[in-house]
A protein has these predicted regions:
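Short, function-defining helix-loop hinge/capping sites that tune catalysis or transport
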Residues: 14, 42, 144-145, 174-176
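Extracellular glycoside hydrolase catalytic/binding regions
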Residues: 161, 169, 182
Length: 183
């Protein structure tokens, strides 16, 4: 098993010297990176990549035997269908196994139920392209309770088996839940 580097936190280092950055993480034993990808919004100033940034990075990633197995994606919360084709193409072209989303901004039961419907639909579309969908937790969706569960647990259960979890144990701990007990 190899560990990966979540690129959001090291975006400055990546921008300053991509090759030097990859040399360092390779020497440290990392073999994967996990970029944050904005599909229709250019937020590169905030550490996000666009699909063309991923394409440009691939030759350098291949040179250092670094894979992109998962990508955090930031989509229009109510119009995922516009991104289906783009995500399917990325999955097939770069062998991305997982696309990672987060909980909605508003963590009320009705919003979580609506989001679960959209996430199931997105997961079904990604499955056709050979990829899956994971939900990444943050502090807020651990702190807020819905029907006696964390909002994160509620959303995962509402999504069903087609959608998995990418548990951020740091945020879980900050939210007051023991990650070991949760897992």
């Amino acid at each position: 098993m190899y560990f990966g580097v979540q690129m959001y936190g090291v975006s400055k280092e990546w921008k300053q010297d991509p090759e030097g950055f990859l040399k360092k993480i390779y020497a440290a034993g990392y073999r994967q990176i996990e970029p944050c990808l904005g599909v229709r919004v250019d937020a590169r100033d905030y550490g996000f990549w666009l699909p063309e940034d991923l394409e440009q990075a691939m030759p350098l990633l291949e040179k250092y035997h670094i894979e992109v197995r998962a990508v955090h994606i930031f989509l229009d919360e109510y119009h995922y269908e516009r991104e289906f084709a783009i995500l399917a193409e990325l999955a097939q072209k770069y062998h991305i196994s997982w696309f990672v989303v987060k909980s909605p901004a508003r963590l009320a039961k009705d919003v979580l139920d609506e989001t679960a419907v959209r996430y199931r639909e997105l997961a079904e579309e990604l499955e056709k392209a050979g990829a899956g969908l994971l939900i990444h937790n943050e502090k807020e969706d651990i702190c807020i309770r819905v029907n006696g569960k964390t909002a994160y647990e509620y959303l995962l259960e509402a999504c069903g088996e087609k959608v998995g979890a990418e548990v951020d144990v740091g945020w879980m701990y900050c939210g007051g839940v023991d990650p070991e007990e949760f897992l």
